[in-house]
Amino acid sequence: MSDLQAIADRVEIEALRGEFTDASMMRDWDRFASLFTLDGVWRMPHIDVELVGREEIRAEVERLRGLWQYFVQTVHPGTIELAGDSAVGRAYVAEFGRFRDGTSNLNYAVYHDRYARTPDGWRFAERAYEVRYVDSTPLAGSAPDVAERAR
C-alpha cells in the first residue's frame, strides 16, 4: 500500500466515524444504517444489544433515540490500523442526555471497530461499545426546544 493510499484510507475512516455521530445527532437513520456493511454488527453489551445488518441497526437506533428527551455525543480520534481492504481501530466517546422518563446519563466509552472497504467506501463491519465510566446524576441543564433552535 502506498503512503498516499494509507493517508487517504485514514482520512476516509476518520470521516466515517464523524458521519456516525453526525447521522445520530441529526436523526438521519437511513444514513446511520448505511455506514455499516450489509452484514455489519453493532454491539452495546452494557444494555445487552447486538444488531446484525442495516435493517436491524436502523430500527434499533431510531427506537433507542426515541427514549431520549435530548442526547449529545462527541467522538475523539483514536487509533486506526490498516490491513489492505480491512482495518481495525478505536474511537473515544463522551455522551450525555436525559431520558424521557426524567433519568439522566453521562458516560465515557470506547468504540472498538472493524472497518471494511466496500465499493461505496469504508464502512463499519463491526462497532462494539465499551462503557468505561457512567454517571446517572440528574443533569441540571436542558436542550432548547426545536422552535427556539429554528430562530
Annotate each PLM feature:
Residues 64-151:
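A beta-strand edge to alpha-helix "cap/lid" segment located at domain peripheries
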Residues 9, 13, 53, 107:
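Hydrophobic (often cysteine-bearing) scaffold residues that line and stabilize catalytic clefts
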Residues 3, 7, 48-51, 102:
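Charge-dense, low-complexity intrinsically disordered segments
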Residues 29-93:
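A solvent-exposed, acidic/Ser-Thr-rich amphipathic alpha-helical stretch
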Residues 1-34, 38:
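Short, low-complexity N-terminal intrinsically disordered segments enriched in polar/charged residues
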